[in-house]
UniProtKB/Swiss-Prot annotation:
Broad class of where this protein is predominantly found: membrane
Cell compartments where the protein resides: Cell membrane
Pfam families referenced in this protein's UniProt entry, alphabetically: DUF576
Covalently lipidated residues, kind S-diacylglycerol cysteine: C23
Keywords linked to the UniProt accession: Cell membrane, Lipoprotein, Membrane, Palmitate, Signal
Family (UniProt): Belongs to the staphylococcal tandem lipoprotein family.
Top-rank lineage group of the source organism: Bacteria
Lipidation sites (N-palmitoyl cysteine): C23
Natural source organism: Staphylococcus aureus (strain Mu50 / ATCC 700699)
Annotated signal peptide: 1-22
Membrane topology: Lipid-anchor
Protein's name in the database: Uncharacterized lipoprotein SAV0440
């Protein structure tokens, strides 16, 4: 009788163990599936990289939904910035945003220079208007600083030289999901041998040998949404309180009307 009870107990433990292991594997499968979905969602945009001639976007269709008015061809918005904290509590950030209207085949935006303090006092922000013609950035505002002027006129978006054909090789990412928004995040370790990392090191002052982290963020439906948002960040930060990163995004939305501006 005692032996039969032990057998029943033993079988119960085995069944419980299998159930726990099965749940664990199920969670792993779900996380792997979400990782693949996030990569697939980004691939729709990243497969377009590198976009050496930004004017190609005038003829490039994006994801369309009910937010688009009839006849609206939409607008591509491309963005790149470089953020660096040289001093504790202070963040220096420079970059450009450009809106390419497919209806008018015109591209306008601005180059920004920000200095942001933790307490927000003495924070500084300056925008310089730009437009693009014949794939060339044209500065519309007067800039006295010759070095800054050259940086603006020679600026290249990350999407113009980035190449993510090997996106599938980024594996075992740290995936987090906020179903209330919804939003999705995935982080992948990169190698200093990665061509994208080499490109960034050649273009920006990155005083660390630390291999960066690739961060993908999506707000909205994974399948696509004109009101959603995708952001790519390559983070070289050495410590939690320091910042050294490049942020890139390319999004397709309804074109802005003059009344909206």
């Amino acid at each position: 009788m005692r032996d039969s009870k032990r057998v029943v107990l033993y079988i119960s433990i085995i069944v419980l163990s299998i159930f726990i292991i099965g749940c664990g594997k199920g969670n792993e499968i779900k996380e792997d599936a979400k990782e693949e979905q996030i990569k697939k969602s980004f691939a729709k945009t990243l497969d377009m990289y590198p976009i050496k001639n930004l004017e190609d976007l005038y003829d490039k269709e994006g994801y369309r939904d009910g937010e688009f008015k009839k006849g609206d061809k939409g607008m591509w918005t491309i963005y790149t910035d470089f953020a660096k904290s040289n001093r504790p509590g202070v963040l220096d950030n420079e970059g450009m945003v450009l809106n390419l209207d497919r209806n008018t085949r015109t591209a306008k935006g601005y180059y920004f220079v920000d200095t942001i303090y933790d307490n927000h006092e003495n924070s500084y922000s300056k925008n310089y208007r730009v437009e693009m013609k014949n794939n060339k950035i044209i500065l519309l505002d007067k800039v006295e600083d010759q070095k800054l002027k050259e940086r603006i006129e020679n600026f290249k978006f990350f999407g113009q030289y980035a190449d993510f054909k090997s996106l599938k090789s980024y594996n075992h990412g740290d995936v987090s999901i906020n179903s209330n928004v919804p939003s999705y995040d995935a982080k992948f370790k990169m190698s200093n041998k990665d061509e994208n990392v080499k490109q960034l090191r050649s273009r920006y002052n990155i005083p660390t040998d630390k291999a960066p982290i690739l961060k993908m963020h999506i707000d909205g439906d994974l399948k696509g949404s004109s009101v959603g948002y995708k952001k790519l960040e390559i983070d070289f930060s050495k410590e939690e309180n320091s910042e050294l990163s490049i942020v890139d995004s390319l999004n397709f939305q309804p074109a802005k009307n003059k009344d909206d501006e």
